[in-house]
Amino acid sequence: IVSFYGDNPIISENLSKLEKKQFTSTVEILKQYEKEKRILFGGTFSKKKLKISPTILRTKLNETDILQKELFSSLLPVVGINDKESALKQISQTSKPLAIYLFGGNKKIHNHISKVTSSGTICINDVMLPVLIPNLPFGGVGQSGIGKFHGEEGFRNFSNQKSITFKGFLFDSNLRYPPYERVKKFLKFIFQI
């Protein structure tokens, strides 16, 4: 973070400012974590500049509010999970996430988690790739969103595929209209052939 933003991220031109309402709600979260001494890194902010330094928050598993909320800020809540079973249990107890981000080199664990979980995306050892690859569909499933965007999938999801049918006037089968005895006789004849 220091190599990206320097020793004081608040004065960095590379750190975006927040919209005022978003800044205020994010600072409230930050103050609560500061009070509980659960800021692992960062935590500085400037009301004048509407900036919050990149901040890592030590979060508990039962704090579903911050873990499921879209923060749209530089806060990163993290939960330490010791093993694969605990991670799977946590994922299965919550609604389907927009994305699951896995870090580590064990391909067996990656494959297993991919098979037994449901999410919009799984990203391994990165957090940006799913939105940086233009033709890769990205989006949620269930409560995290419906449909995908990016590339061809995005075009399909944001387009209205309209069905148009046309029937001419020259031929109009009376099999479509009551009484349906004629239809039954016709179908019996067809299926006997």
PLM region descriptions:
Residues 1-2, 52-193:
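Conserved C-terminal structural/oligomerization subdomain of aldehyde/semialdehyde dehydrogenase
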Residues 1-62, 124, 186, 191-192:
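ALDH superfamily catalytic-core signature
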